[in-house]
Amino acid sequence: MLRRRVDRLGRFALQAAYGCQGEAPPCPVVFASRYGEVSRSVDLLDNLARATPLSPTSFSLSVHNAIGALYSIARGDTTAYSAVAAGEETVEAAFVEGCALLSDGAPEVMVVVYDEPLPRPFEHFPAQVKMPHAWACRLRAADGESGYSLTCDAAAGAPDGAGAQGLPEALSVLRFLVQGDERYEHRVGPRLWRWQRHA
C-alpha cells in the first residue's frame, strides 16, 4: 500500500526512517523537510487550472505531515510525530524539536531529514536543495561525558549561504555527524548555528 501511495521523496524518507528504527522500541519522530512533497501540490494546482478532477489520494498526501502519518499508520505507532519546515534552518529546527521532546521526558527521539529540488515552475528560485536526499538519526540526552551541542547566536559578518564543501545544508549536517569533525557552523541571515562535538 505504501509503495503505491508515496512518490520518490516519500520512499526515500520512509526508507531512512525504517532503517534507523530497526528493531528499537517506538519513540517520538520529527520529520523535517524544507519543501516536503511540493511536486504533489504543483500537480494539484495544475489540475485545478485545467479544471480536471483532483485525486483524493494526492490531496491527502500533499500536506507536510503526510509522510510521517503514513509511517505512523503503517507501523501502528501512536507515539508523538511532528513535521517541521524552517527554510534554511530546517535541520536545526528538527534538532531543537527533538531536544524539546527529550526535555519533556522522551528517552529517545528519531529525526528524519528529507528533501528534493523544487519542481517546475519553481526551478528559478535559488537551488538550496540540489539533490534528493534523506537520512535519519536517533537522539538521546547526553550522559555528560560525550555528545553534541547546538547553539544559536547572533552572526557576525555576511552569511555564507553554503554548507560544508558546497553541500546542501542537510547533507552538511549529516557529514558533520558521521565524519567526526569537532565543529560545524551554519550562518543564516542574522543567526549563526554552531554544532559542536564533545568527546
Question: What label would you give each PLM region?
Answer:
Residues M1-S58, S62-A83, E89, V113-A199:
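Conserved "HGTGT" condensation-loop signature of ketosynthase/thiolase-family condensing enzymes
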Residues L14-A17, A85-V109:
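Active-site-proximal alpha-helical scaffold in enzymes
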